[in-house]
């Protein structure tokens, strides 16, 4: 079993390369229609490449916005990150493996801190968290948004300033609330009347005044998958503004002796590219803020607009620049506050995916390759790798789209419509639904999937009793293990039968 050594020196720096164009493909392009994810492999049986997926001029080329800044390919087509080649990574760490570009993650955290200067920026730990990453984002000036006792324990272990930690969650246990209060977290985001009552009693018992924000739903339907759109009414998070529960929750917190009501929190979803949803949510939230001020004579000092900033998974995705987004949100908030005749509260946001996502890729080794004939004479290449839905469930869960590249050699073969699949006993075990890979992809090749830093390791499982891959960080030609590879022995140690 591979265990990546804690420090490895690379043999040399990477160098950019130019690759020729002129590939030929005889298939046709059409639009993929997704149905229920469990049957997606059958539903797509007669489909072609989706309309957003262009036939590449060069099947070896990388699209820079999908990758961390430290990634390139050398003249032989070998992918390198921060001076370390994927062939070295595979040899030293095994596959599958999540590979984090430390400098890139730090730079993205720093960019949000600079773009939203004067705001509080909390890194959304749910996207990816380990002790090292908690330290990195803190060192780059960010707070931390956690939503379980486990995530809070990582923050505590990392030694971050707990006054800059927010505790989220729609169903926090009494133990988690106690953990947050005794640790001294900077704020607890309350999500139900049950929680307000529970937290108020616990704070009185501990004689600790709990700083709270009220999570509201604004009724905004973000342009994203239903399961990650969190501000429409029919879902588990927050208090409805339209239904009046949000105003009642604010009053309940204001009336509670041991609660210090700081403000309102909203979050409209994830993987959002357009500012329109944020604009509507901010206006509705600020109206509630102003109504509470008129009713109580007290203007709440804080407002959190959440996160959900999208990243590029494919060539069809165009993420917003954080500086452009910051200017737009400032303008919206300032204009709305002026119209409502209230002071601008201290603002905060919670980026997660936008920091961790592009900073990492997943590296796999090909095990089998097969051709499947489609209607009309076209074909699809099924490339099976040594990972799958246990290390990235998003394609199966959300019909998420990803990209991939042949990572350890240059190919002169034409592009072939391919589907990268895993090793699990499940028809929906798909990692990359549609991609053009070289037609000569073969067993033993390395495949890299970009933008795998968010919600891959975080949502990983042990389906089929497969151990979870390690997470390694690369910086200045050195490799460090952040999370070691699980082993079958680890899994058996949990089995008490």
Features from the language model and the residues they span:
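Non-catalytic peripheral regions of nucleotide-handling enzymes
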Residues: 1-27
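Active-site loop/helix belt of alpha/beta enzymes
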Residues: 31-61, 218-370, 437, 464-466, ...
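Active-site-proximal loop/turn and secondary-structure-junction residues that shape catalytic pockets
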Residues: 127-129, 150, 171-173, 192-194, ...
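Hydrophobic residues within beta-strands of alpha/beta enzymes
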Residues: 144-145, 165, 188, 264, ...
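A charged N-terminal "starter" segment
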Residues: 28-211, 256, 260, 441, ...
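Charged (often Lys/Glu-rich) extended helix/loop segments that serve as interaction or gating elements
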Residues: 328, 334, 342-497
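Short beta-strand segments
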Residues: 124, 211-217, 265-267, 304-306, ...
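Short acidic, glycine/serine/threonine-rich loops at helix termini
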Residues: 133-134, 156-158, 177-182, 199-202, ...
């Amino acid at each position: 079993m591979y265990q990546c050594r804690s420090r490895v020196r690379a043999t040399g720096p990477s160098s950019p390369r130019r690759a020729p164009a002129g590939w030929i493909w005889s298939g046709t392009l059409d639009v993929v229609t997704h149905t229920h994810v469990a049957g997606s492999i059958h539903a797509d049986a007669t489909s072609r490449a989706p309309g957003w997926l262009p036939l590449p001029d060069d099947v070896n080329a990388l699209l820079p916005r999908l990758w961390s800044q430290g990634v390139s390919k050398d003249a032989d087509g070998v992918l390198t990150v921060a001076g370390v080649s994927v062939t070295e990574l595979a040899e030293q760490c095994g596959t599958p493996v999540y590979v984090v570009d430390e400098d890139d993650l730090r730079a993205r955290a720093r960019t949000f801190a600079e773009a939203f200067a004067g705001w509080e920026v909390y890194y959304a730990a749910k996207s990816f968290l380990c002790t090292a990453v908690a330290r990195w984002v803190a060192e780059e000036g960010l707070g931390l948004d956690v939503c379980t006792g486990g995530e809070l324990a990582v923050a505590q272990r990392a030694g971050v300033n707990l006054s800059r930690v927010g505790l989220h969650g729609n169903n926090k246990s009494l133990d988690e609330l106690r953990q947050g209060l005794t640790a001294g977290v900077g704020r607890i985001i309350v999500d139900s009347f049950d929680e307000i009552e529970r937290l108020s009693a616990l704070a009185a018992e501990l004689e600790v005044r709990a700083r709270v924000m009220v999570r509201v739903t604004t009724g905004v339907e973000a342009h994203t998958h239903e399961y990650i759109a969190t501000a429409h009414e029919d879902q588990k998070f927050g208090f409805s503004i339209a239904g009046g529960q949000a105003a009642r929750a604010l009053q309940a917190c204001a009336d509670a002796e041991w609660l210090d009501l700081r403000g309102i929190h909203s979050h409209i979803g994830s993987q959002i590219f357009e500012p329109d949803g944020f604009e509507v949510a901010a206006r509705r939230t600020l109206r509630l803020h102003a109504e509470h001020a008129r009713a109580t004579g007290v203007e709440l000092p804080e407002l959190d607009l959440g996160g959900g900033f999208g990243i590029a998974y494919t060539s069809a995705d165009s993420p917003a620049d954080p500086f452009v987004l910051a200017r737009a949100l400032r303008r919206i908030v300032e204009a709305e506050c002026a119209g409502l005749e209230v002071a601008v509260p201290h603002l905060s946001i919670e980026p997660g995916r936008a920091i961790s996502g592009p900073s990492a890729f997943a590296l796999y080794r090909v095990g089998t390759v097969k051709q499947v004939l489609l209607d009309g004479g076209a074909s699809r290449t099924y490339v099976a790798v040594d990972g799958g839905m246990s290390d990235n469930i998003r394609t199966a869960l959300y019909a998420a789209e990803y990209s991939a590249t042949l990572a350890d050699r240059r190919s002169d073969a034409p592009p072939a419509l391919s589907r990268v699949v895993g090793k699990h006993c499940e028809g929906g075990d798909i990692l990359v639904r549609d991609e053009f890979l070289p037609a000569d992809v073969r067993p033993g090749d390395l495949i890299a999937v970009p933008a795998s830093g968010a919600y891959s390791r975080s949502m990983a499982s042990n389906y089929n009793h497969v151990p979870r891959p390690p997470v390694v960080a690369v910086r200045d030609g050195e490799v460090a293990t952040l999370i070691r590879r699980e082993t079958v022995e680890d899994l058996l140690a949990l089995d008490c039968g």
